[in-house]
Design a protein with these regions (language model features):
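Membrane-embedded catalytic interface detector for glycan/lipid assembly enzymes
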Residues: 21-31, 102-276, 288-305
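Hydrophobic alpha-helical transmembrane segments
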Residues: 3-8, 26-41, 158-160, 229-235, 238-240, 259, 281-282, 400-401, ...
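N-terminal "leader" segments that precede or initiate the main folded domain
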Residues: 1-136, 238, 242, 261-293, ...
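Hydrophobic, aromatic-rich transmembrane alpha-helices
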Residues: 36-46, 215-229, 401-416, 471
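Small-residue-enriched transmembrane helix-hairpin modules in multi-pass membrane proteins
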Residues: 193-203, 291-407
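Hydrophobic, lipid-facing residues on alpha-helical transmembrane segments of integral membrane proteins
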Residues: 5, 9-17, 170, 216, ...
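Hydrophobic alpha-helical segments
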Residues: 379-474
C-alpha cells in the first residue's frame, strides 16, 4: 500500500510541476513532466504485475502520455489550458487508480476468505514477457484455452467453436460490406480524388456489421493459440481470419479499423501467453506503418491540405511528425475549448447515446438523439479524448464519476480474467486494453460501435461457456 501512495505522490508532484511550468510559458518542460509521469506509472504497474498489458499502466501511458505530447503546443491551434482542464485530467487518473486499487483489494480479501486460489494461476494480468527471446505458450490446467493444457475430449469442441466463430464473423462482415458497396455504388479504395470516401461509406444499421471484421483477427489468434496447445499447426482458416479482415479495412481506406484489427490481434496473442522476438515486433511495426501510409495516400489528403489545417508553428515540420502529433495533441486542445465555451451541460445524453442508438429508442423518441454542438479548435479536427463526453454531460463531477466507475470495472475485470477459463475473456480484456492505450483518440465509452464490439464479444463468451457446459454434461 505504501508503494501505491508513493506512486501517486510522484504522479501528483509531476502534475504540479507541469502546471507551474505551463503557467510560466515553458511548454516543452511542462510536457516532459507529464510524459515522465506516464512512463513512471506504466513501469510501476509493470513491476507490480509483471504484465505489459496491465490496464492501469496502459491508461497512464495513453492518456497521460497524450497530455504530455499536447503540452508541447507545437501548433498555433494550441491555447493555454484552463484550470478546469488541468483539474479534469489530473483528477481522472487519480480517482481511476484509487478505485481500481479498491476493487483489486476487496477482491483479494474476498478470495482469501473463500479460500479461492484459482486467480493465482491465470493469464490476463500476469503473462510471460512478450519481449523474451523465444516464442512459447504456457501450459496450465484447462483444455482449449490458450496458455492451458487440453484434454482430447475438449480439443474437438474448442476448435470447432473457434472455426464457427471465425467463419461467422467473416461471413457477416463481408456480406455487409458487399451490400454497402452495392447499395452505395462505390468502394472507397477505388474512388479518385475523394478525400472523405470512407465517411460516406455507411448504410445506417448495416455498417456496424461490416466493421465486425475488426474482431476476426483477434479471434483467429485465439484459434491459433488453441491449435498450438493441441500440438497443431496453423491452418488455412486461421490465415484467412487474419488476412481477409485486414484486406477489408484497406478496401474501406479506414486507418482506424486497420489499426484496431492489428493491435487487438497482437494484444490477444500477448495476453494468451505468446512470446515474440524483438525483430518480429519491429517487422510487424514496419508493416503497419507501410499499410497506414498506403491508406493515408489513398484517402487523397495532400500534404498541403493537411499542413494548412494543422497550422504548425514551424511550417517546415515534416508531415510524418505533424500528422500523428496533431491526431493526439489537438484532442486535448478540443477538450480545453469545451471547458471554455460550454455553457449548458447535456446531463447524461451524450454518455447514454450508445444505449439510445443500439436499443432503437432514438426512433421512438427522436429528441434523445439530437445533436449537440461540438467544441473544437477547427471544424476539420473533430477527434476528442475519452473524457470529453463525461465533462460535456456533468462537468468535473462527470469526470470524477466516470473515473470511479471505470476504475472499479477495471479492477474487477482484471481479477475475473485472471481466473476465468473462457478464452473469450481475453478478447474482452484486450478491447479494454486497446481503448485505454488510445484513450486520447475518441470518446470510446459513449461510442455505439465500442459497445457493439463488446456486446458481440460477450455473446461469443456466453456461447463458448454454454458449449463447454453442454459438452461436460454429455
Amino acid at each position: 500500500m505504501k508503494t501505491e501512495w508513493f506512486k501517486l505522490g510522484i504522479y501528483t508532484a509531476a502534475y504540479v510541476m507541469s502546471f507551474v511550468l505551463g503557467e510560466a510559458g515553458l511548454s516543452a518542460p511542462s510536457g516532459l513532466c507529464l510524459i515522465f509521469a506516464a512512463a513512471f506509472l506504466y513501469l510501476s504497474e509493470y513491476r507490480r504485475t509483471a504484465s505489459l498489458m496491465n490496464l492501469r499502466g496502459l491508461l497512464a501511458l495513453g492518456l497521460l502520455g497524450g497530455e504530455g505530447i499536447a503540452r508541447f503546443q507545437l501548433s498555433r491551434l494550441s491555447t493555454d489550458w484552463t484550470l478546469e482542464t488541468w483539474l479534469s485530467f489530473y483528477l481522472f487518473y487519480l480517482i481511476f487508480d484509487l478505485s481500481a486499487q479498491l476493487a483489486d483489494h476487496t477482491g483479494a480479501i474476498r478470495s482469501a476468505r473463500s479460500g479461492d486460489d484459482a486467480d493465482r494461476s491465470a493469464s490476463c494480468s500476469v503473462v510471460p514477457d512478450p519481449l523474451a527471446s523465444t516464442a512459447s505458450i504456457d501450459v496450465r490446467d484447462v483444455g482449449g484455452v490458450p496458455g492451458r493444457s487440453a484434454t482430447g475430449e475438449s480439443a474437438g469442441v474448442d476448435l470447432r467453436f473457434f472455426r464457427y466463430a471465425i467463419l461467422g464473423l467473416l461471413g457477416i462482415s463481408w456480406a455487409a460490406f458487399l451490400f454497402e458497396a452495392r447499395r452505395l455504388g462505390f468502394v472507397p479504395l477505388f474512388t479518385v480524388d475523394t478525400p472523405h470516401a470512407y465517411s460516406y461509406f455507411h448504410v445506417k444499421g448495416v455498417h456496424y456489421f461490416t466493421t465486425l471484421a475488426v474482431l476476426t483477427p483477434a479471434v483467429s489468434m485465439l484459434y491459433l493459440a488453441a491449435r498450438r496447445t493441441h500440438g497443431l499447426r496453423p491452418d488455412v482458416l486461421a490465415l484467412l481470419g487474419l488476412l481477409l479482415p485486414i484486406i477489408l479495412t484497406i478496401l474501406m481506406v479506414s486507418r482506424f479499423q486497420f489499426m484496431i484489427s492489428v493491435i487487438l490481434a497482437v494484444f490477444v496473442a500477448l495476453l494468451s501467453g505468446r512470446r515474440y522476438k524483438l525483430w518480429q515486433l519491429l517487422l510487424l511495426l514496419a508493416l503497419m506503418i507501410a499499410a497506414y501510409v498506403f491508406i493515408t495516400i489513398e484517402r487523397a489528403h495532400s500534404v498541403e491540405y493537411l499542413n494548412g489545417i494543422f497550422e504548425m508553428k514551424d511550417p517546415s515540420t515534416p508531415i510524418f511528425i505533424t500528422q500523428p502529433y496533431m491526431y493526439i495533441a489537438n484532442n486535448y486542445d478540443n477538450f480545453n475549448v469545451m471547458t471554455r465555451e460550454l455553457t449548458v451541460h447535456a446531463h447524461g445524453l451524450r454518455m447514454l447515446y450508445p444505449f439510445v442508438t443500439l436499443s432503437g429508442i432514438k426512433f421512438l423518441i427522436p429528441s434523445l438523439a439530437q445533436g449537440f454542438p461540438l467544441f473544437v479548435t477547427k471544424e476539420e479536427l473533430t477527434t476528442v479524448t475519452m473524457l470529453y463526453d463525461a465533462w460535456y454531460d456533468f462537468g468535473l463531477i462527470g469526470i470524477a464519476v466516470f473515473a470511479l466507475v471505470l476504475g472499479l470495472v477495471s479492477g474487477r475485470v482484471t481479477r475475473t480474467c485472471r481466473k476465468d477459463q473462457n478464452p473469450f475473456s481475453v478478447l474482452l480484456y484486450a478491447q479494454l486494453a486497446f481503448y485505454y492505450l488510445v484513450s486520447f483518440f475518441t470518446t470510446w465509452f459513449s461510442n455505439p460501435a465500442t459497445w457493439f464490439y463488446l456486446g458481440i464479444s460477450f455473446l461469443l463468451y456466453l456461447a463458448y461457456a454454454c458449449t463447454v457446459r453442454k459438452r461436460r454434461k454429455e
